[in-house]
Amino acid sequence: MPKPRMSWPYQRHRQASSPPHPHKEMNFFPQQPLPLGAGPGQMTFPLNWQMGGKDLTKGLNMLTLSPQQPGGKSGQQTSKGPENNLYSPFEEKVRPCIDLIDSLRALGVEQDLALPTIAVIGDQSSGKSSVLEALSGVPLPRGSGIITRCPLALRLKKKECPWQGRISYRKVELQLQDPSQVEREIRKAQDAIAGSGVGISHELISLEVTSPEVPDLTLIDLPGITRVAVGNQPQDIGLQIKALIRKYIQEQQTINLVVVPCNVDIATTEALRMAQEVDPEGDRTIGILTKPDLVDTGAEKVVLNVMQNLTYHLKKGYMIVKCRGQQEILNKLSLAEATKREIAFFHSHPHFRILLEEGKATVPRLAERLTVELIGHISKSLPLLFSQIKEIHQSATEELRLCGASVPSNDADKMFFLIEKIKVFNQDIENLAEGEEIVKEKEARLYNKIREEFKSWIVTLDCNSKKVKNIIHEEVSKYDRQYRGKELMGFVSYKTFESIVRQYLEELVDPALGMLQTVVEIVRQTFSDTAQKNFGEFSNLNQTTQNKVDSIAARAAERAEGLIRLQFRMEQLVFCQDDIYRVDLKAVREELFNPVAEHPQSLQLRLPFVNGPSPVSSITEIGVHVNAYFMGTSQRLANQIPFIIQYCVLQESRDHLQKAMMQMLQGREQYSWLLQEESHTSAKRHFLKEKIHRLAEARHTLSKFAQSLQG
């Protein structure tokens, strides 16, 4: 391995190495994991969550493991065999945790959410396959080019029984009687899924190995990273592989196991770079160094710097292993013998022996470490996992409800089915018109949306009232210049008053019609959305309803526009009851000329046309009458126009639409056509039913697991 480079965006972290342990005669095939980073003598998985209203903290505290002998050191190993009384309690607690996640994966829950797992990634020729072979005890496909073409879930189960294997993919499940069958069956599975060429697939192959010689562990093996397409490989094969790898390693539930050869520059490793992209702080990444026997003389210090986290910092640190070389594989060196040679290599190496003593070297140590990491990760993930499954289950159930039941084949049943559909739709429309519909958070009811438009109408009336005051001066001046006869100054012209009033009213027509169109569109869109929600899976029924909604909305807009224009034509009469007008006129005069209640400056603010020493002029007098008249007119229009719009656009539209929907039931010959489902609806319903079933099974599995912890 060349000199370390600082090209990665990590600072160098100097961590105190574990103190070297005094060398003693050791058994390097330990039966219990040693929890690196845990407190002395124990490993605790804290968890505080509830299921079914019960606090599971007490039950999950049972996951506090004490795998070490009292007084023992972390570098020491206990002897192998049934006499080891500490392994059994550990195994009893570890296996159920891993089985829980494996059972959820077998149910297909990974289609819906990420499960806690360890993903193994590495560049091509990094030694990834050799590491997995050493952990599993079975030969995996080897060769040049892309060998792993599908994700492989490697489920290792430690059990005192003869070796057993099982491979499953798609609808195939095959029992294996001998480890030698594994490589051939994996190749067959990959050919069946990804084709017999060099393509890859995201579809998972599951390999379960049960043996007394394997650790309790589940790993996901992913294709090796390649940079250049070779031979018949697709030109974008590198991008395809990276996309597949990223799909797994980007999940927060995944521990990334990155395999890196000792004899390459760590800064050039694509696998570590990809892990850094999705895990910038290195919180869930473990580095595995391979091929230590290929390190050039004098470069051992570089490897030690990496192992001591001084080159590329990972919070979970590094392990180092020596697996079978190519010549040893050709010589058919057994995995058991390879493990003995690995231990002897580190034990006799002047530089790497310290790593063995610190518990950071050899495949058995790696197996221990990975088991501990996976169990800790699972325990931390359980509360979120249960919450996610519950939430997705509820969402899928609601989605299935919206899809509705399957359409019956019998004509009579179709009628009742359609009646029920229309009944639910009409009730939704009724709730909208009455302001009683159920809305989601941050959404507003239809009535509130319309009310906001009516509020803007009041603002329009106020703005026009202020605008008309400026018109008075201009209109009266125009009268004085053009039409004044023998009248003395100060006499009010009623014609001028009428002209100002009518001009003011005419300017309100367009804003009123604009508000009408806005409300029509709000109601039309809401009714349309309601039809889509109820009939979305039936294209003919939905389109028929949408057409009725559009037609009724257009008729409502036309009728409301006619009434609004009629209202403004009536307003041109300029009429008010004497008693009402007298009260309004008195109020305006008192407000305008009361010297006690008003400062002189306020008069100018309200009536900017008042000028000169005598406020009582023809302009002022007309202004008083205009204010008095529009006091009542504005109040009338503020309510009358919304009344017209609300009645025509909302209330009448509701009645017409509900009647039109019921009339659809009269055409029995159209039932089949109206209830013709979208082509994808049946498939969607089937998909949702399967999803709900597996999530219900997952919730049941989690509940049973929690109950087992409670005792």
From Swiss-Prot:
PROSITE patterns, per the entry: G_DYNAMIN_1, G_DYNAMIN_2, GED
Binding site for GTP: 122-129, 221-225, 290-293
Biological process, per Gene Ontology: defense response to virus; innate immune response; receptor internalization; response to virus; synaptic vesicle budding from presynaptic endocytic zone membrane
Region (G5 motif): 322-325
Single GO molecular function: GTPase activity
UniProt xrefs under CDD domains: DLP_1
An example Gene Ontology CC term for this record: microtubule
Compositionally biased intervals (Low complexity): 66-82
UniProt-annotated stretches for the region G2 motif: 147-149
Keywords for the protein's UniProt record, in alphabetical order: Antiviral defense, Cytoplasm, GTP-binding, Immunity, Innate immunity, Nucleotide-binding, Nucleus
UniProt-annotated stretches for the region G3 motif: 221-224
Chain spans, region G1 motif: 122-129
Residues annotated as domain GED: 619-710
Induction: By type I and type III interferons.
Domain annotation Dynamin-type G: ranges: 112-383
UniProt similarity note: Belongs to the TRAFAC class dynamin-like GTPase superfamily. Dynamin/Fzo/YdjA family.
Name of this protein: Interferon-induced GTP-binding protein Mx2
